[in-house]
Amino acid sequence: MTRYIFITGGVVSSLGKGITSASLGAILEAQGLTVTLLKLDPYINVDPGTMSPFQHGEVFVTEDGAETDLDLGHYERFVNATMTRKNNFTTGRVYADVIRKERRGDYLGGTIQVIPHITDEIKVKIREGADGADVALVEVGGTVGDIESLPFLEAIRQMRIELGDQQTLFIHLTLVPYVAVAGEIKTKPTQHSVKELRSIGIQPDILVCRSEQPLPDAERAKIALFTNVPEPSVISLSDVKSIYEIPLILRDQGLGNRVCEKLNIKATAADLDDWKKVVQAQKNPRHTVTVAVVGKYVDLEDSYKSLSEALIHAGIHTQTRVVIEYIDSEAIELHGTELLKKVDAILVPGGFGSRGIEGKILAAQYARENGIPYLGICLGMQIAIIEFARHKAQMENANSTEFDPKTPFPVVALVSEWMAKEGIIEKRKWGDDLGGTMRLGGQPCRLKIDSLARRLYGEDRVIERHRHRYEVNNDLIGELEKKGLVISGRSIDDRLVEMIELADHPWFVGCQFHPEFTSTPRKGHPLFIGFIKAGLAAKEAKKAVLAAPSQEKTD
């Protein structure tokens, strides 16, 4: 029997419902339970795949090829479960499926309404996503009081009635602000948020109160009194330097035990020693390395959320504080590579469109010519190919057909056909819809013997997640290989280039996939760990060169 924990948010958005949900999931998992997490998004887009990163942040890709909310990235980084397309759905997806059923005649001519048809569809999708788990944590996007969230809130209200309070639990996350002018903590916003939730028919069982500093006991008692929530169920969650501390903070306040008690679950004590090790390693680095992330969405760091976390994970596993310098590629076009002079390593992430492309190419050229560690991810690998073709293979004006359809040397072109993991042949052509038509999800990759990639992974075949519709042009690969480009990874059917390296460079790697999606704080990822180690080595080499003249003078 699956138990359901519904997590809602009040007062303001961006309080951290996703991280709180994931942290509770980590606690329950440590107590011996199988856990899954769902994210319900109230926007009308079918999925976030075609949304601007500036509006939505990162699009997280699941193993089965779904383009989902970035919170699913938090879920996978905190719990061992692998998310699927069933773990995230939107209002748009719900309405699309209901309308499809209506057109098919499934409702026998009935009038289609929000209640019961939309709410019933939401409940069906929640149950499908939760299937097989001991506990399903269901995060409802948006803020209580938003019109968009009402069908989701009504659906979970109905699930409480249908399943009872031994199988369902409501957790409400609110803001408890500190007003500096008055020198007081204000509980009134939380009181009103709970009042709004109760007017919908939902009484929260547990409150998680977000604040700058830990809540005093007197304020917790006051909140409990005015919200009808028992005082032990009012949890204080103040700001922390590392999100990986949160499972420990919530565990120490007894949140996992309270949940198990209310849901009548017999569970063991939560052993979070691995999280303690993660936090200790992050707080006590022995080295520092500076990484330039050269992109076009740098004004919103959530656009590269999994990427920044993967670099932090690599730092944890190399005892290194990773300083991330986000550099707009258009700024490099304007001011040149002087912006890269002080960094120890360069990373060019994925992206779409022609804006800022030449700045990324300059960054790749700077890394190649100066022996600086380079990691190109997805578009970043394609950028490295274009730069190499132009400046090493004498292919003047080489480009991707995404940016220049008439380029004389189309070293990167549209992927028209590939074999999916299940052996199914997928096909695409110009003019297809943008949504959901890329090469998506986990795909197997065969690594070249004696390559850097093979040494980093320690195996000859890996599965990594993809999100792209352009690939390296096989017709021109031979010419590039003659000039020193190493194809270190290929798709299992040998049709697509998955990884590249440079034989005469200390550490230069490109991958068509997104390794950041499978990096976790407890395990890291071999490519990022290798990248940070290379950055440290480059930093030490630079220091040695700078120290050499002064040593000669001393002698």
UniProtKB/Swiss-Prot annotation:
Q: How is its activity regulated?
A: Allosterically activated by GTP, when glutamine is the substrate; GTP has no effect on the reaction when ammonia is the substrate. The allosteric effector GTP functions by stabilizing the protein conformation that binds the tetrahedral intermediate(s) formed during glutamine hydrolysis. Inhibited by the product CTP, via allosteric rather than competitive inhibition.
Domain Glutamine amidotransferase type-1, chain residue ranges per copy: 290-541
Q: Which residues bind L-glutamine?
A: G351, L379, G380, M381, Q382, E402, R469
**Which InterPro entries does this one have?**
Class_I_gatase-like, CTP_synthase, CTP_synthase_N, GATASE, GATase1_CTP_Synthase, P-loop_NTPase
Q: Where is the active site?
A: C378, H514, E516
What does the entry list as the binding residues for Mg(2+)?
Answer: D71, E139
Q: Which residues bind CTP?
A: S13, D146, I147, E148, K186, T187, K188, P189, T190, Q191, K222
A Gene Ontology biological process term: 'de novo' CTP biosynthetic process
Q: Which HAMAP family match?
A: PyrG (MF_01227)
Family statement drawn from the similarity comment of this UniProt entry = Belongs to the CTP synthase family.
UniProt-recorded name of the protein: CTP synthase
Look up and give the organism this protein is from.
Answer: Coxiella burnetii (strain Dugway 5J108-111)
The gene designation is: pyrG
